[in-house]
Amino acid sequence: MPEGWKRSNLLDIANYLNGLAMQKFRPADGENGLPVLKIKELRQGSCDASSELCSPSIKPEYIVHDGDVIFSWSGSLLVDLWCGGTCGLNQHLFKVTSEKYPKWFYYIWTAHHLARFIAIAADKATTMGHIKREELAKAEVVIPDTASMERIGGIMQPIYDLIISNRIENRKLSTVRDTILPQLMSGAIDVSDIQL
């Protein structure tokens, strides 16, 4: 290992916050609810009209924003950069954050161990496979020295920023398409005078 680099584990580089049982946090009467981020929404990359709602008054750390790293640790194990809009974090999902390391770093290391986590969950599965927090502590990572981390980050950070930005833009364009296309098809929007 290069001088100044060190071995560590996932729990040392990031915080893995488990979501809430959102059925206990429904919106109050007259309150505009937040969609609930469950495994279904994580897999499809967005919330939709069928997504459950929770109170927007939940603790801020349980609110998911575009660009947050989300790790599904039960059932369908996956890790993703959430770009599906603001929502509430449901149980069986970790919101992954760090005060010490950049997002690209803990995302890459979590994704690196995903295949092993899936195998562990499959071996233990009697009903729904999952991994325990102790598996995160066993998942080894290598931390570069500060100069190397900055050099690598200079390459990785813009790539991850662009991925997040493009996915958010894609979501917004899909919303515009889904709003305008039915109006164009029905003739509610007249485009006959447009010169091409």
Residue ranges and their predicted role:
Residues 1-21, 138, 142, 146-191:
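Non-catalytic DNA-recognition/assembly elements of restriction-modification systems
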Residues 11-26, 33-66, 83, 88-89:
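Sequence-specific dsDNA recognition surfaces
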Residues 38-39, 57-116, 120-124, 132-133:
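A short beta-sheet element
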Residues 48-49, 105-107, 151:
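Short, charged, solvent-exposed linker or helix-capping segments at domain edges/interfaces
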Residues 55-57, 96, 160-164:
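Short, contiguous acidic/charged loop-to-helix segments that flank catalytic cores in large enzymes
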Residues 127:
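Extended, charge-rich, solvent-exposed interface segments
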